[in-house]
Amino acid sequence: MVRIRIRAIGKIKESFIRDAIADYAKRMCSFCQVECIEYPEAPVPDTHPSTIEMACVSEGEKLCSGIDSLDYVIILDRTGKQVSSEGLAEVIRRCEIEGPYQLVFIIGGPHGLSKDCLQKGNIILSLSAMTFPHQIARLLLYEQLYRAFTIIRGLPYHR
């Protein structure tokens, strides 16, 4: 059984989003072990580019600490490659077969990720060309993970 660890900046504040994420996590429990680790946003006292970059570096260090060399790291970033649900399913299927990978998804804060953090990914993906709040992006990730597992298993959820 594949293990998925989601490392994200910020907490889910809205209860309806937390409930939806919990529902998808529960649905996935027969396919994988999923865990989410949340890290606090770095303070950004002003909008000076160097202040924002320092916050991104600080957040990136937290997000990328403890990643094992065997982990398959998927970074979610607006600059990443867009893939279909079937494409994500193929990435997960390969990791299940080739193992002993743990899939690690990294979701940065509102200012994005540092260059160092981006370089630690095996692949950089974008959920959409549109911009979403990070809470919604996390919910979309859970839904797409569940959809990917149903595609892999040939279940009727994905049509």
UniProtKB/Swiss-Prot annotation:
What Pfam families does its record include?
A: SPOUT_MTase
InterPro entries, A to Z: Alpha/beta_knot_MTases (IPR029028), RlmH-like (IPR003742), tRNA_m1G_MTases_N (IPR029026)
Q: Where are the transmembrane segments?
A: none
What PANTHER family does the record point to?
METHYLTRANSFERASE, RIBOSOMAL RNA LARGE SUBUNIT METHYLTRANSFERASE H
Q: What is its EC number?
A: 2.1.1.177
Does Nucleotide-binding count among this protein's keywords? Answer: no
Q: Where does S-adenosyl-L-methionine bind?
A: L76, G108, L127, S128, A129, M130, T131, F132
Listed GO molecular functions? rRNA (pseudouridine-N3-)-methyltransferase activity
Broad class of enzyme this protein falls into: transferase
* Name this protein carries in UniProt: Putative ribosomal RNA large subunit methyltransferase H
Taxonomy of the source species: Archaea, Methanobacteriati, Methanobacteriota, Stenosarchaea group, Methanomicrobia
Tell me what reaction this enzyme catalyses: pseudouridine(1915) in 23S rRNA + S-adenosyl-L-methionine = N(3)-methylpseudouridine(1915) in 23S rRNA + S-adenosyl-L-homocysteine + H(+)
Localization, per the record, is: Cytoplasm
Question: What keywords is this UniProt entry annotated with?
Answer: Cytoplasm, Methyltransferase, rRNA processing, S-adenosyl-L-methionine, Transferase
What does the record give as the function of this protein?
Specifically methylates the pseudouridine at position 1915 (m3Psi1915) in 23S rRNA.
Q: Which Gene3D superfamilies match?
A: 3.40.1280.10
Its gene is rlmH
Q: Which GO terms describe its cellular component?
A: cytoplasm
The family classification in the record reads: Belongs to the RNA methyltransferase RlmH family.
- Which cysteines are cross-linked by disulfides? none
